[in-house]
UniProtKB/Swiss-Prot annotation:
GO molecular function: cobalt-precorrin-5A acetaldehyde-lyase activity
Protein name: Cobalt-precorrin-5A hydrolase
Catalytic activity: Co-precorrin-5A + H2O = Co-precorrin-5B + acetaldehyde + H(+)
Top-rank taxon, per record: Bacteria
């Protein structure tokens, strides 16, 4: 049991991604039910409601004010599901709030389990989606108040998140969000990435126009813009970002061959310099691809892990199934494949051509492909 003491960190045991907290008889029943439904959740409730099976169910009980439990939960979990009145929760979490980019999702449920309310980190932290899931599980009413959700328009801070898109900078997210929900003229410029970003059943709102180039969008003089591209903007295009957000879709496949024992530092430097020459963003890399012989190459594995890229390798037979511009008998002699970087990038991306066919630099050979999306 957790003994809560003023000024001391609560000694919790985290197993899942979400914490479910209750302090009333009815709340405990709801919490236990959610613990059974959501396997990635840890249940916490007051020891006075002990049932006898808590250890078996991995339920953690506590004594003392729940207020002293929340700081530990806040820094440990992706989301908190709290079965306490909204007002009480607001008062308890106010002193421990830090930043919308790092605070966990907070969802509140009333004592009868009739309403599930998204309280904190609705978009970035995922509280809105968590609210919908919990409400569906309890057959309760989801309460979501963020303007873009209510109006069913583009949530600027979540745009493309399900595809892995990332912002170049968060500086203009708030003003651009205001332009979207205030129904001002919005330009969506998409040069690469998944096209299925609109997921509502109704059409895209009339104030949102799509463009295939930044120049065309600039000529339309929108109030704000969402720009989706893997490349660096030219100087004359940068005006689009005065009230705009630049998104980096995950669309680049790096094909790579290297000598055994090549350092991660050398591999990383080659990738950085190559993409800079192409005027492509590192943030748009999705995968690092190579031959099966290199599946345990420490330098490749380290770089892929550092950036969170997929690490993919192919057999010589798979690589030889791709027609390449520069087949090498020497490479075939040592690997069984006529090329590594070129066919690996093409296999992963599904592209018919390469943005960079092949470049040799020191111990590394690199090719770059752009993943096409129709």
């Amino acid at each position: 049991m957790i003994q809560l003491e003023e000024g001391k960190k609560a000694p919790i045991t985290q197993r899942g991604d979400y914490a479910v907290v209750a302090i009333t008889k009815h709340g405990v029943e709801i919490a236990r039910n959610l613990g059974r439904i959501f396997q990635q959740s840890d249940v916490y409730y007051m020891s006075k409601f002990e049932k006898g099976d808590e250890q078996e169910q991995n339920i953690q009980m506590f004594s003392g004010s729940v207020r002293m439990l929340l700081p530990s939960l806040f820094e440990s979990y992706k989301g908190l599901i709290i079965i306490i009145s909204l007002g009480a929760v607001v008062r308890m979490i106010a002193p421990i709030l830090k930043d919308k980019k790092t605070d966990p999702a907070v969802v509140v449920i009333d004592d009868k389990g009739e309403n599930v309310i998204s309280v904190l980190s609705g978009h970035i932290g995922g509280a809105n989606e968590l609210t919908r899931e919990v409400a569906a599980a309890l057959r309760a009413h989801p309460v979501i108040t963020t303007a873009s959700d209510v109006q069913k328009t583009i949530p600027v801070d979540l745009f493309g998140k399900r595809f892995g898109w990332v912002w170049e900078s968060a500086e203009n997210v708030t003003p651009v969000s205001a332009s979207v929900v205030n129904e001002e003229e919005i330009a969506v410029v998409q040069e690469s990435g998944e096209k299925s970003w609109w997921h509502y059943e109704h059409p895209v709102p009339a104030n949102i126009k799509t463009y295939s180039s930044i120049q065309t969008a600039l000529e339309a003089s929108p109030h704000a813009a969402l720009v989706v591209t893997h490349r660096d903007l030219k100087k004359e295009e940068e005006a689009i970002l005065e009230n705009g957000v630049l998104y980096r879709p995950k669309v680049l496949a790096i094909g790579m061959g290297c000598n055994r024992g090549t350092s991660a530092a050398e591999i990383e430097t080659v990738i950085e310099k190559t993409l800079a020459e192409l005027q492509f963003s590192m943030k748009s890399v999705k995968a690092l691809c190579t031959i099966e012989l290199k599946k345990d190459e420490e330098g490749l594995l380290e770089v892929a892990s550092k950036y969170g890229w997929e690490f993919v390798y192919y057999s010589p037979q798979e690589l030889n199934s791709i027609s390449i511009q520069q087949p090498s008998d020497t490479v075939f002699k040592y690997t069984g494949a006529y090329g590594v970087s070129e066919p690996a990038a093409m296999l992963y991306s599904g592209a018919d051509t390469l943005e960079l066919v092949k470049k040799k630099s020191g111990n590394v050979t690199i090719s770059v492909a752009l993943i096409p999306y129709d």
